[in-house]
Regions:
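N-terminal Rossmann-like dinucleotide-binding module
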Residues: 1-51
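C-terminal helix-rich "cap/oligomerization" subdomain common to oxidoreductases
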Residues: 1-5, 71-74, 109, 116, ...
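Beta-strand-loop-alpha-helix segment that lines the small-molecule cofactor/substrate pocket
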Residues: 2, 71, 77-78, 82-130, ...
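Active-site loop of classical SDR/Rossmann-like NAD(P)-dependent oxidoreductases
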Residues: 16, 39, 294-305, 320
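Conserved SAM-binding strand-loop segment of SAM-dependent methyltransferases
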Residues: 53-59
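Predominantly a Rossmann-like dinucleotide-binding segment in NAD(P)-dependent oxidoreductases
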Residues: 121, 129-222, 342
Length: 351
């Protein structure tokens, strides 16, 4: 697209959209935010006023049918990602969609199919951002043989974890009707791991909802179908195996850390005082040492810049393309299937 002004409609103005996507898009030269549709006309009007967006729409479909709008940014909960993405692509609009990609892999494949049917349009999923400063360095270390062949991945994800909060309020992330097969932070960490060592070939999972029910706004007790503690075992496609433990209900738990163990070395990405750091060591070393990351390898958040550049034809989408996003949705589906059946699941599940 070579036009000077790219007009973007915002559909769903949640916290990340207001914090990241709206200001990020407004910072791009030649971009105009022309409309916003949130969950109600009142909230749409409020967001439009707060962020200087031209018009508040009554419904997201009003943005889809507006021929003056070139692209949409979708910041809704996952249950609407597929219907809005597909409708926008069919209407000839470029799409930037918040993560997680969809409710499940079937929806993800439908989104990918709609995008492939319209190769002139850009479709991008917001990437897992937490490892961006480290990704290129880890990729280079693995590719250059720093760990040799992959033996094992040990991932402990406890960000935000505490003893069970029995009186905590329901959240959309606990609601399978809104969140689908996405569970806690497992998807964003698997997406990061795929950048480093590729996808899994098999999945076996066990888990539970320790907080089994919560009270909704009316005081009614409702079940929590999404686990707050899971352990996932995988065989990796390139060899080696993975053990990932994710929880929000472990009191006094160690900080989040992910280690790649190889035949010749080890890489560890670990959280301390809320910040991630990178360490590595090789055969013969007595301990892991901090990795000095070259300035040119320090990645960061540039989602909106990448999207607009892709729309203008000056950059290809890498963070994240729909093919990659479908792979993490297939893995999430496999985790849920294994949780349900107690059996191992082979990937890919759909072709």
């Amino acid at each position: 697209m070579s036009k000077d002004i790219i007009r973007v409609g915002i559909i769903g103005a949640g916290a990340n959209t207001r914090l990241r996507h709206i200001p990020g898009l407004q910072a791009q030269p030649g971009v105009e935010l022309t409309a916003v549709a949130n969950r109600s006309p009142e909230s749409s009007a409020r967001v439009a006023k707060e962020h200087g967006i031209t018009r508040a729409a009554d419904h997201w479909r009003d943005i889809i049918v507006d021929e003056a709008i070139d692209a949409v940014c979708i910041g809704t909960w996952p249950y609407l990602h597929a219907p809005i993405t597909i409708a926008a692509l069919e209407a000839g609009k470029h799409v930037l969609c918040e993560a997680r990609m969809a409710m499940n892999a079937a929806e993800g494949h439908a989104m990918l199919g709609a995008a492939r049917a319209r190769p002139n349009l850009v479709a991008q999923i917001v990437p897992a951002p937490h490892t961006l400063p480290f990704d290129q360095t880890i990729i280079d270390l693995v590719a250059d043989g720093a760990i040799g062949d992959l033996v094992a991945i040990h991932a402990l994800v406890t960000t935000g974890s505490d003893f069970p909060q029995w009186d905590s309020a329901p959240h959309w992330r606990y609601d399978r009707d809104l969140s689908g097969n996405n569970i806690m932070m497992m998807g964003i960490w698997y997406e990061a791991l795929m950048r480093w060592v590729g996808p899994a070939a098999t999945v076996h999972a066990v888990g539970q909802a320790v907080v089994k029910h919560r009270k909704d706004a009316t005081g009614r007790r409702i079940a929590m179908p999404i686990p707050d503690l899971i352990d996932v075992l995988c065989r990796m496609e390139q060899g080696g195996q993975m053990r990932m433990s994710v929880s929000t209900v472990l009191g006094l738990a160690p900080d989040t850390e992910v280690s790649l163990y190889g035949t010749e070395g080890t890489i560890k990405l670990a959280e301390s005082d809320g910040k991630l750091g990178l360490w590595s060591g090789r055969r013969g070393d007595s301990a892991l040492q901090p990795v000095q990351i070259a300035p040119e390898n320090v990645g960061g958040w540039r989602v909106e810049e990448e999207f607009i550049n892709a729309v203008r034809g000056t950059e290809a989408v890498t963070h994240t393309d729909l093919v990659t996003a479908v792979k993490y949705m297939e893995w999430s589906d496999a985790v849920c299937q294994s949780l349900s059946t107690g059996e191992s699941v082979h990937l890919p599940r759909l072709n």
